[in-house]
C-alpha cells in the first residue's frame, strides 16, 4: 500500500514549531524605542530593474518592526517581475497604473485603487499591461514568518535583465514633486 501524500492529506496537524531563545521584553522595548520612527523615503533609492524596481522602507534586516516589511514597487511600461513564490502573504495597494498578476496560473487584473493579495505559497508574477509606469505599495508579514523560522522563497523565473521596448530608458520616479504619474 502506498503512503498517503502530505500535500493532499486531510490528516490533523499541528503547524506551530517551538520558538525558543533568550528574550527580554524590557530590552526589546528599549531597542525598538531607539529605532527611527520616521523613514525618509526621499533618502532611499530604488534598486533592481530594468523592468521592476523596489524601494524598501522597512525590511526585516532593519529590525525596526517585528511584523512588517514595507516597500514600493514601480513597474516600467510593459514591465514584469520575476516569477517566484514565498511563504509570507503580501498585499499590493496599487497607487497608479494598470496591470495584472498571474497567481498559480490564474490571471487577476488590477488598476489604481485596487489591492492585490498574494497568498502564502502562491507562485506569482506581476505585470504592467500599460504604456505608462505602474506603482504599488507592498505590505508583508515577512519578519514574523522569519521569526517563526517558516521562511521559504524560491525564484522560478528570474527578473528580466533587459528593458521592454516601451520601457527603454525608463527610470523610477524617485525625486519628483508629484509622485503621481501625469496624464
Residue spans for each PLM region:
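A short, N-terminal "cap"/entry segment at the start of jelly-roll beta-barrel domains
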Residues: 1-66, 152-183
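Short beta-strand His + acidic residue motifs that chelate non-heme Fe in jelly-roll/DSBH
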Residues: 81-84, 101-102, 118, 124-131, ...
Amino acid at each position: 500500500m502506498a503512503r498517503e501524500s502530505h500535500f493532499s492529506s486531510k490528516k490533523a496537524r499541528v503547524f506551530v514549531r517551538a520558538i525558543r531563545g533568550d528574550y527580554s521584553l524590557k530590552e526589546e522595548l528599549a531597542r525598538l524605542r531607539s529605532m527611527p520612527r520616521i523613514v525618509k523615503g526621499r533618502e532611499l533609492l530604488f534598486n533592481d530593474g530594468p523592468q521592476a524596481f523596489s524601494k524598501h522602507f522597512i525590511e526585516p534586516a532593519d529590525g525596526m518592526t517585528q511584523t512588517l516589511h514595507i516597500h514600493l514597487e514601480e513597474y516600467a511600461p510593459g514591465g514584469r517581475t520575476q516569477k517566484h513564490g514565498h511563504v509570507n502573504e503580501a498585499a499590493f495597494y496599487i497607487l497608479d497604473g494598470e496591470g495584472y498578476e498571474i497567481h498559480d496560473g490564474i490571471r487577476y487584473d488590477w488598476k489604481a485603487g485596487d489591492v492585490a493579495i498574494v497568498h502564502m505559497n502562491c507562485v506569482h508574477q506581476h505585470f504592467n499591461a500599460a504604456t505608462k509606469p505602474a506603482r504599488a505599495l507592498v505590505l508583508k508579514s515577512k519578519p514574523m514568518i522569519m521569526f517563526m523560522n517558516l521562511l521559504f522563497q524560491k525564484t522560478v523565473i528570474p527578473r528580466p535583465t533587459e528593458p521592454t521596448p516601451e520601457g527603454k530608458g525608463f527610470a523610477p520616479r524617485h525625486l519628483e514633486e508629484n509622485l503621481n504619474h501625469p496624464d
